[in-house]
Amino acid sequence: QLANHNLFNKSVKFGLKRIKLALKLLDHPEKKLKNVISVIGESGKFTTLFSLRSFLEASNQKVTTHVSPSLRDIRERFYMGKKYLTHKKIRATIKQIEKLNIPLTVFECLTLVYIINASKINAEYNIQETGALWRLDSNNVNDFPLIQICTNINKQHLNFLKRKTLDEVIQEDVGFM
């Protein structure tokens, strides 16, 4: 249902140009996120993210997380300090994004939903699960993440990334190394 919305660009061209323009028009909410932690890789990301979130919360730290995909409900993607965003808040944020009039991908829009709302929480840590194409992933908009955690990388995304070797997949997934 969300993917059929007229806001979204139907052809996916990976890159950061659209989301960076949106963030600029929104007055850079990503710059308000403290202690950004990126969890990068192909498998084990959710377990790593969830474990880290649990450890930080056990130390009485306020944490936000952004995961993809959601398993049962879109709200699972947006954890904001001990609670998930409501459907009403997600819809209201998408309406705010619509006003920018930028043809975004669904993932870019959902990343913006996270960033906009996380920027208002003032959490001590903001943990983002990053996708298969890290270098051009819409979560890759923070200039200086506190930590970048790399989980398992394998041949799972060879065809999706149009790569022939595991070394090429590693360059895309972990472009900072």
Task: Show which residues each predicted segment covers.
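Charged, amphipathic alpha-helical linker segments immediately N-terminal to NTP-binding catalytic cores
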Residues: 1-10
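ATP-dependent carboxylate-amine ligase catalytic core
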Residues: 16, 20, 24, 29-33, ...
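Hydrophobic anchor at the beta1->P-loop junction of P-loop NTPases
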Residues: 37-39
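Hydrophobic positions on the alpha1 helix immediately C-terminal to the Walker A/P-loop
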Residues: 48-51
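Walker A/P-loop NTP-binding motif
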Residues: 53-57
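Inter-motif core of Ras-like GTPase G domains
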Residues: 140-153
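Membrane-proximal helix-turn-helix segments that form the acceptor-binding/catalytic region
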Residues: 170-177
